[in-house]
């Protein structure tokens, strides 16, 4: 079945797709179709910030992906939670709001990506942002759709984390991790609006769905892009009511993320020719870079447990308090359930030669659960060390020409030896922090890696056994001007007209922070690139 043509067909109602659909449909004469493989984002575990652990591990909300066995991680398969729901991974993520470092974007521009320097992208960060606590309009937006705020009453353990950094010395406090100099330790902001997750689905898409020129198709999986005479003319969709074709008279906009955007390009004959031919897929455009340059932030946690009940968590001793917290959230959407748990962090340089923070220490004032129970059972805290600028690069490849078969994802985590060094330095620092007087009153015991892991060899063994990623995959449809680039600086796919990629897959290199806000920025800028509008002519703030 074929339906009437739309001007724009957007594949994926994730973080970028929701933004793009809302912006393009602002013109009431433009018909936009947004297609999502998952269902609506209506579950409580999505809305309630403290249930983030349940959301990100819920198979009904994700694609259920894992990586290929990782050579440098004892051949383990690493979970790869990617959202399969309206809002995409922005409906299951930790809600942390970071932009990365300004130098990251200047590096993009220096590589030939004109229009992507920090000065170029800052207006697009501001455009989407409604920062409740930061009203500096030179750096922050104050009337954008996405609410950004501090947790109103952080857990007391956060103060111990900050005091520990002060005690160790050599690091400075930072009161704005999204400002011009995001280095140091401090409390951090999240995308939470009055006690609820404020994803791009909630902030951008829900209000836009009132427009008659915007159509949302859910539980509809795009199986391929229609290519005629080197031009994208629409997409093929599989849904409960059968297959259909959705034509696009202007452009097809691929917002399926760093795993599924390259998968769809390759299924449509756009990618490495030898790989496509090996699966019997006719080649529409030979682009060797499709699926290459895939990378993510390697991450490793130190976990501690304690009898003290200050941390977030459930126990018999805190049952009355937990019932009060539940009532507080139900009545006022406040209290511990209104927190995303990730309330403080540090972005620091682990070596003297770094020109910007190269590791993040993310503090979690809750016991790390080895299971998927919605809230932490017991009490404790954890610090996750994140390598912000890994050298290792992996790839996404097709396992089959059948679009129902999951692609093969090999991030090559820590395959480059230099990627382990920042994590090792971070492990030593975390132990220093935990040994300061700030944490002494809590009498916490390290359970992972455990005090028996003393030497660097022991800690490297723990790294192989326990390291994973921060779930920030990017780069698999890289923007650039060289032969390995998949899209140009206007996000157009090379060699195919009327087709763009608009998501984290286009990042030339990963940014030094969480990737949700930068992906929103990419979509905001893409809307201007597509329509020819400029930021200054659309919105203030």
PLM features: residue spans?
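N-terminal redox-cofactor-binding region of secreted/periplasmic oxidoreductases
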Residues: 1-541
